[in-house]
Amino acid sequence: MNGTEGPFFYIPMVNTTGIVRSPYEYPQYYLVNPAAYAILGAYMFFLIIVGFPVNFMTLYVTLEHKKLRTPLNYILLNLAVADLFMVIGGFTTTMYTSMHGYFVLGRLGCNLEGFFATLGGMISLWSLAVLAIERWVVVCKPISNFRFGENHAIMGVSLTWGMALACTVPPLVGWSRYIPEGMQCSCGIDYYTRAEGFNNESFVLYMFFCHFTIPLTIIFFCYGRLLCAVKEAAAAQQESETTQRAEREVTRMVIIMVIGFLVCWLPYASVAWFIFTHQGSEFGPLFMTIPAFFAKSSSIYNPMIYICMNKQFRHCMITTLFCGKNPFEGEEEGASSTKTEASSASSVSPA
């Protein structure tokens, strides 16, 4: 084994020289240069000062403007809540522990940080899947005369929380566990060991199938069908200028959504799967640290992609920031036609 396993931790370094110490009790500067911990802390600080205001503003603006309280925006609000969980429960903890060079908060702190960070990520991931289903049902109309209403939105939000808790609670009660990972300043699921009594293997397989493969398949299927529906609608209308413009807008949004999802989650999931299937192989602390913090950056990507590209929300946000006035009123009105065009394209069912 090319690492050192201890009670509730795994250090990616063989303890041949006797310098490996518990990440709950001693600084881990023997793993990487101390400057790396300072960089990690600065990165966490950046995510906090950007992620918290953007997601908090999303909640505040939606509550402030009644016209934004639509069923679809329930899911978008759920995304903001998930991101705030990650910011408050995960990023602040990681920033604090990186300043000390080890997980100074102990086992309880590791469980809490791992739980809240993973919970936020899972709620976010399943919210994206529910959004994909909503877009598919509304645009492609696989169910005739179906309207996405408040009850459907509440069911979608409940589903995201139920699935997220089904993934994050088991490690707290003995099915797998949360341990420090990477530079040992943040905690995650134990992909690294086959510790007796925790059944890590079965939990990781369950998590990857139910909480990564399934939502990823849903997202690709729904957005794939959405693109086909828009193209078929454009062909049926002989590719009018209005439809072409709407098609480009929807296509751009879908591409950004999928790329954002993959950038955030695929590197982390791929590395975690590699570590799980190659337990005992040699890898450095940065091997898991870098993709883990790509995933954490989703707290910024989500509101930018799913909220700030919404013209109506952007107008309300600017109005709120400027105390009831929108200094860019003319520009917003000039862009409103695109929104109408996209809506008209969405109302055409595929041939």
Swiss-Prot record:
Residues exposed to the Extracellular side: 1-36, 97-110, 174-202, 275-286
Residues of the signal peptide: none
Composition bias type Low complexity, residue spans: 335-351
Principal subcellular localisation of the protein: membrane
GO biological process: absorption of visible light; G protein-coupled opsin signaling pathway; visual perception
Motif ('Ionic lock' involved in activated form stabilization): 134-136
Keywords of this entry: Cell projection, Chromophore, Disulfide bond, G-protein coupled receptor, Glycoprotein, Lipoprotein, Membrane, Palmitate, Phosphoprotein, Photoreceptor protein, Receptor, Retinal protein, Sensory transduction, Transducer, Transmembrane, Transmembrane helix, Vision
Entry's transmembrane regions: 37-61, 74-96, 111-133, 153-173, 203-224, 253-274, 287-308
GO molecular function: 11-cis retinal binding; G protein-coupled photoreceptor activity
S-palmitoyl cysteine lipid attachment residues: 323
Residues carrying covalently attached carbohydrate according to the record: 2, 15, 200
Functional summary from the UniProt entry: Photoreceptor required for image-forming vision at low light intensity. While most salt water fish species use retinal as chromophore, most freshwater fish use 3-dehydroretinal, or a mixture of retinal and 3-dehydroretinal. Light-induced isomerization of 11-cis to all-trans retinal triggers a conformational change that activates signaling via G-proteins. Subsequent receptor phosphorylation mediates displacement of the bound G-protein alpha subunit by arrestin and terminates signaling.
Protein name: Rhodopsin
Source species: Sargocentron diadema
